[in-house]
Amino acid sequence: MNKVRHFIDTQDLSKKEIFEIFRLMKMLKEARYCGAVPELLKNKTLAMIFEEPSTRTRVSFEAAMTLLGGHAQYLKPGELHLGVRESLYDTTKVLSHMCDGIMCRALKNETVLNLAKYADVPVLNGLTDYNHPTQAICDVFTMLEYMPATKNLEYEDIKFEDIKVVFIGDRTNVCSSTMHITTKLGMNFVHISPKRYQSPQEWIDIANENIKQANSGSVLVTDDLEQVRGADIVYTDLWWWVDQEDEAEERVKAFKPTYQVTPELMEKAGKQALFMHCLPASRNVEVYDEVIDSDQSIAFEQAENRLTAQMGLLVYYLYPQIDKSSNAVKDYYRGKVEAFMEHQDRSWKQRYTYNNDYAETKNKK
């Protein structure tokens, strides 16, 4: 069995590995459209830990495991109290013995890091307060799939230095992941937001190191909406999440109307600009209906590619761990178990006949 690898952060991947995952995603998407997804994870189980509810993450991982011939076990919020009823170490070890992979959507990044530290099977990061790497893989794959300048090119032939991605809004975990994967590939990333909600310096430092390694790209954090001009991608996210409801009014005042993605903003970006949103969206709050439902929007194609991404990631990380027994070995154990059960069946029938005969004799007396 190969050494266990985990998917915690796109920073852990090389450019070559990202392209490998993209190629795998493309093959599996084509196979799904043909109704011919190979059952590469047949009889395998994925434990899915959710510390908060989710629609797209849960459905996409469950559907992906089903298509690949496996099964996803949903461990809902409140069902597991990680580190409370049972230590995180113990929970991880138990799941490692029963399942073939663990996906975790955690409140804290530390939880996923510790899962990966203790697990004997691959751990996939389904979202934390710091990042959302499965979303990032999905998003860049979608960008390259739909941008006219890139959709017909091999990944190695793409001029990433010519691509401009503009993220408008709060410094969310999606913003963090988008900044880091785009700069790792050598793209130009711009975060436009009120100063209070701009990306922190530690995120920018990682992006600058990525740019240095890629030898192309740039990163800019600003409150200047003029920087949206020439964007290939205009991306936004919710202004607040469920645990920030008490800040909602304050955040609306900070973002509205200046940082809403409106038809006028998309016009400023240019006709080439495509609109993206990780969803769920608060319509007519961070984005207007006229934008998310427009021909420039690929938000729902992006959502579909969550399934594509999960299929690719599950195969990339779980498949190498599978012990691929020969048919002869499978036939041996099948025969052995069937022979045992046939013997048990005969024994049971004999006991059943004896008990019935005994009962009838007793009743006659």
Swiss-Prot record:
One of its GO terms (molecular function) is putrescine carbamoyltransferase activity. Its EC number is 2.1.3.6. Coiled coil: none annotated. Keywords: Cytoplasm, Polyamine biosynthesis, Transferase. It catalyses: carbamoyl phosphate + putrescine = N-carbamoylputrescine + phosphate + H(+). PROSITE patterns: CARBAMOYLTRANSFERASE (PS00097). Carbamoyl phosphate binds at S54, T55, R56, T57, R58, R105, H132. Its main location: cytoplasm. GO terms for cellular component: cytoplasm. SUPFAM superfamilies: Aspartate/ornithine carbamoyltransferase. It is found in: Cytoplasm. Putrescine binds at H277, C278, L279, P280. Pathway: Amine and polyamine biosynthesis; putrescine biosynthesis via agmatine pathway; putrescine from N-carbamoylputrescine (transferase route): step 1/1. Homotrimer. Catalyzes the phosphorolysis of N-carbamoylputrescine to form carbamoyl phosphate and putrescine. Is involved in the degradation pathway of the polyamine agmatine. This is Putrescine carbamoyltransferase. The gene is ptcA.
